[in-house]
């Protein structure tokens, strides 16, 4: 069974068509990168997959189930980390994770597991308000992993991070990939991030899929890497360095 199936989905906001007839399938255990410039429709597409927005047309199935009829079941297998995740500044990392774990009726054992998984042991007593950008992103990932999600959505998780913090997060995600139990859908502006982490690449622009497939299938004699492929498809350069936080 496909992990995710998107069938001819469309979404508009007033006079702007954000997503135009998108169809795709994602298999269990795949790490998928959604690439596109601002306004390409990738965030809207992901929010529909997450059940946060409803398509105007078409259907999205996760493990063969749609959000309309099976929201309660699907919430149990989904993890998500938004680009601007905010935490209560006066709670420590461990206290924050205990709070979110209580929503899933999970105990201290799972809190310990995600602290270890996201390499936050040395910071678990630090208050959220004192964390660096990289540490906040690792905390956001730890929260997203609490309920053992089968499908994990990350919205530009390393945007604005320094290169060292970015590499730390990549290594954590590579470890998650090696376990083979999680499907990841990642939006990113970093071609290197997509090439390093993901085996399934989807390039969007103006609400449509321009190219999709395995990385080695997408590259050819005219496009030796994702940067070149993206420029050839869109005439735009995606991987501009954002301001470091």
Where are these regions (language model features)?
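ABC ATPase "signature
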Residues: 212-213
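Catalytic Walker B motif of ABC-type/P-loop ATPase nucleotide-binding domains
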Residues: 152-156
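Conserved ABC transporter NBD signature motif
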Residues: 58-69, 73-74
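Conserved ABC ATPase signature
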Residues: 127-131
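Conserved ABC ATPase "signature" region
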Residues: 98, 102, 108-123
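Helix-to-loop junction immediately C-terminal to a conserved catalytic motif
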Residues: 50
């Amino acid at each position: 069974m496909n992990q995710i199936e998107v069938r001819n989905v469309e979404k508009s906001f007033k006079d702007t068509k954000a997503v135009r007839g998108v169809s795709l399938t994602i298999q269990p255990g795949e790490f998928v990168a959604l690439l596109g410039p601002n306004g390409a429709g990738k965030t809207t597409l992901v929010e529909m997959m997450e059940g946060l927005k409803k398509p105007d047309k078409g259907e999205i199935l996760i493990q063969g189930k749609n959000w309309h009829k099976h929201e309660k079941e699907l919430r149990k297998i989904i993890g998500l980390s938004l680009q601007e995740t905010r935490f209560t500044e006066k709670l420590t990392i461990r206290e924050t994770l205990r709070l979110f774990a209580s929503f899933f009726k999970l105990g201290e054992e799972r809190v310990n597991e995600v602290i270890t998984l996201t390499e936050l042991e040395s910071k678990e007593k630090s208050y959220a308000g004192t964390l660096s950008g990289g540490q906040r992103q690792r905390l956001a990932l730890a929260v997203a992993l609490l309920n053992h999600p089968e499908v994990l959505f990350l919205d530009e998780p390393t945007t604005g991070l320094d290169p060292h913090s970015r590499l730390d997060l990549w290594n954590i995600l590579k470890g998650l990939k090696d376990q083979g139990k999680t499907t990841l859908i990642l939006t990113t502006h970093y071609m290197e991030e997509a090439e390093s982490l993901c085996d399934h690449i989807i390039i969007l622009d103006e609400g449509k899929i321009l190219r999709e497939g395995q990385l080695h299938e997408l590259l050819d004699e005219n496009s030796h890497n994702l940067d070149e492929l993206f420029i050839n498809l869109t005439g735009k350069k995606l991987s501009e360095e954002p301001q470091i936080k």
